[in-house]
Amino acid sequence: MKMYDLPDKRGHFGPYGGTFVAETLISALDELCKQYEYYRGDAEFQTEFFRELKHYVGRPSPIYHARRWSDHLGGAQILLKREDLNHTGAHKINNTVGQALLARRMGKSRIIAETGAGQHGVASATVAARYGMECVVYMGSEDVKRQATNVYRMKLLGATVIPVDSGSRTLKDALNEAMRDWVTNVGNTYYIIGTVAGPHPYPMMVRDFQAVIGNEARQQMQEEYGRQPDALIACVGGGSNAIGLFYPYIGEENVRMIGVEAAGKGIDTQKHAATLVTGRPGVLHGNRTYLIQDENGQIIETHSISAGLDYPGVGPEHAWLKDCGRAEYVAITDGEALAAFHALCRFEGIMPALESSHALAYAAKLAPTLRKDQLLLVNLSGRGDKDMATVAQQSGISL
């Protein structure tokens, strides 16, 4: 692949991305673009960002060889990039630290966020507490029920959690409400989008803050294995953990990049969230990307056992990587993800998030088809504490 320098100045990844928002937000986004372009090249900002990642988040996150599970499956060796070990338990904190530091430099006193699984909400509430800022988190009321523990964590951290009862009452609807808040309070408010979606510059900005995952992985693989992995595997909802791992590898065409979406009850049903596998291009939440929509262009309600993958869109960079053939996208069902969740618990003593379990499930399918000396690097994007009630319920156990 020739030198990769996307997005362009207007935020496009080929035909995807861009800025499709109300006129009232254009000046706020222009200002954000200007400020981010300045600070991404500012040595002092970058030094503070990486210092926070080291001393507050606990980076670098290690790469762990899941030896027992690999032996059990046969075939390729499965390696895990342990984002679950970060402060707050997932990759989301990488991005919220970066955006909160930017918000402070822009003179904002209030941050807002949307959240699905609650991890981005917790990470946003965490940095708000760290930097002494007001925090409001929008969350679909369906997700509030599914993720009661994370809701309480956000409140403990001082955030106000606002349940959203419109639409499917999930991440899509929370994002809509957060956008409305931002339009109204743009003077003192910074909107921390949690994934690589939304209007420009968010897909680029979130990618840049999450690229620490892939940059660390490249160095760690070279030091520990003397080479890079044969394939990268990461779950994809909006796609920030995946793009964080993939981005530094885009130019290495001998490394496969595999994004794993939620097939829910099956992609032949209406109960899934496999946007890139089944969707087609359209505009949602400020950018052009693949969407799950009906023949009239109306968004179809999605389903996944994991709240963080339950989204009808996807980051525009993933849409571009799919179209140009650099990345592959597959889908894993609720049942397959649950089986992988239990397997990692039993074989490695590691409890993965249900989102990450989708990536693990595909690794478990792929590994036996490959040689023993081949390496699969899976992004273990988060830990599974938040999913205890869901997993127990699936096993017929009431907590």
Curated annotation (Swiss-Prot):
Keywords: Amino-acid biosynthesis, Aromatic amino acid biosynthesis, Lyase, Pyridoxal phosphate, Tryptophan biosynthesis. It catalyses: (1S,2R)-1-C-(indol-3-yl)glycerol 3-phosphate + L-serine = D-glyceraldehyde 3-phosphate + L-tryptophan + H2O. The keyword Amino-acid biosynthesis applies. Its cofactor is pyridoxal 5'-phosphate. The modification N6-(pyridoxal phosphate)lysine is found at residue 92. It is an enzyme of class 4 (lyase). Pathway: Amino-acid biosynthesis; L-tryptophan biosynthesis; L-tryptophan from chorismate: step 5/5. It comes from the Bacteria. Belongs to the TrpB family. The beta subunit is responsible for the synthesis of L-tryptophan from indole and L-serine. NCBIfam families: trpB. Tetramer of two alpha and two beta chains. This is Tryptophan synthase beta chain.
